[in-house]
Amino acid sequence: MEILVPGRATLAQLEAIWREGRPARLAPEARPAVEAAAARVAEAAAGTAPVYGVNTGFGKLASLKIAPADTAQLQRNLILSHCCGVGEPMPPSTARLMMALKLLSLGRGASGVRWEIVALLEGMLAAGVTPVIPAQGSVGASGDLAPLAHMAAVMIGEGEAEVGGRRLPGAAALAEAGLAPVALGPKEGLALINGTQFSTAYALAGLFEGWRAAQAALVISALSTDAIMGSTAPLRPEIHALRGHAGQIEAAATMRALLEGSAIRESHREGDQRVQDPYCIRCQPQVTGAAMDVLRMAAGTLATEANAATDNPLVLSDGRIVSGGNFHAEPVGFAADMIALALSEIGAIAQRRVALMVDPTLSFDLPPFLTPEPGLNSGLMIAEVTTAALMSENKHMAAPTVTDSTPTSANQEDHVSMAAHGARRLGRMVENLAVILGTEAICAAQGVEFRAPLATSAPLGAVLARLRAEVPRLGADRILAPDLAAAARLVRTGALARAAGLPLPAL
């Protein structure tokens, strides 16, 4: 169970909810502020002054006054009318993270919902009731309306949810877990669907996967350096200190530790006629380290957003209920674009290392395509082509999405963030990157084994052994698709990087 303190939840807590499926609830100290804001909304609902989302219509219809007798129906209609999502459903782990993020936003005490709403979300997370949420339909302002409406629909006994491995109507799913639908009070429907939690959940998932890929890239690239008999001189600490970028310094230090004690490296420290290695070997800290810095910048933005009140209107500390624009997911869109750039570049330089290792004119005496009998066998020829295809896909997907605004809702919502699909694409990019890195690991392992009797370092030897437990050495040609998939799994689970047994940079 993760106890979330609104405004102070950590990325580690959010990753545990996403990766391990932990339930979450708000810290008890959040309750007084939540209930105070709810009381203020109830007071406004009983008055005559127009308050957006309490006794008015929504969006372009905000100028239309709603009769007091219709305010409950207003909130229910809002949820039903906004359930317009299409496409495949969100992954359950990401949907649960979205629910936890909504808890955090409501817990800031600025949304005006009753504690009953918070308790139902907590109960759904604890009982494993996960709304089925179509993943397409949000433009990231005014919040992630359609996907969050599908979440809220289950809370009022509509929509669909998964529970116990079964997909059920919303009311039945709640009943299965011993929960009851809630009747929405003033503003509560709006508070549930206004916010950036869908986009932020997807962006955080991409961040967590991206960081794991960056760690794997450091380990695998060190193995590639040994396979190619690359120089470790460019890893010297002073080079990186003279530039000063934290990620670059960490990347170089990690690679130095990984390569320490390599007999392959010692064998060509003297007398090597190559003056400089290609950039994909020599500039690894500068590229992967820069990607790490970018991922950390995105992490800072997303950590702030995860703890933010992104509702509209907001109940301020002086009791005023004021319309604003915190629902606009521009920060999330920028963060998603940054993550996409980092993923693309990690993959781009990894693909060049794959190309280097299979090319006999560049690989420093490795056999063509890393096969012991070239000609009769094609070896890793087409595995390299696959990495090129995936690299190109990722380059295409790395184009910014946040710049692609379009007006919606009769021009009332005339600038939007497109953060939702900017964050969603990260999942596919990570899948591609894992295959690129896994294929690099296969090539590097094959290359290092061709250097026998010389051996790599102890940490990298352990990495090679972990890979070989899943992917046998390539001799005669065989179907390689299962090998590429197995290596990609080792990247995505973190097992390959952990096998080195050394500390790796932390997010």
Swiss-Prot record:
It catalyses: L-histidine = trans-urocanate + NH4(+). The keyword Lyase applies. The modification 2,3-didehydroalanine (Ser) is found at residue 142. GO terms for cellular component: cytoplasm. Keywords: Cytoplasm, Histidine metabolism, Lyase. Contains an active site 4-methylidene-imidazol-5-one (MIO), which is formed autocatalytically by cyclization and dehydration of residues Ala-Ser-Gly. It holds the Pfam family Lyase_aromatic. Its EC number is 4.3.1.3. One of its GO terms (biological process) is L-histidine catabolic process to glutamate and formate. PROSITE patterns: PAL_HISTIDASE. GO terms for molecular function: histidine ammonia-lyase activity. The keyword Cytoplasm applies. SUPFAM superfamilies: L-aspartase-like. InterPro entries: Aromatic_Lyase, Fumarase/histidase_N, HutH, L-Aspartase-like, Phe/His_NH3-lyase_AS. There is a cross-link at residues 141-143 (5-imidazolinone (Ala-Gly)). Its main location: cytoplasm. Signal peptide: none annotated. It is found in: Cytoplasm. Pathway: Amino-acid degradation; L-histidine degradation into L-glutamate; N-formimidoyl-L-glutamate from L-histidine: step 1/3. NCBIfam families: hutH (TIGR01225), PRK09367.1 (NF006871). Belongs to the PAL/histidase family. This is Histidine ammonia-lyase. It comes from Cereibacter sphaeroides (strain ATCC 17029 / ATH 2.4.9). The lineage of its organism: Bacteria, Pseudomonadati, Pseudomonadota, Alphaproteobacteria, Rhodobacterales.
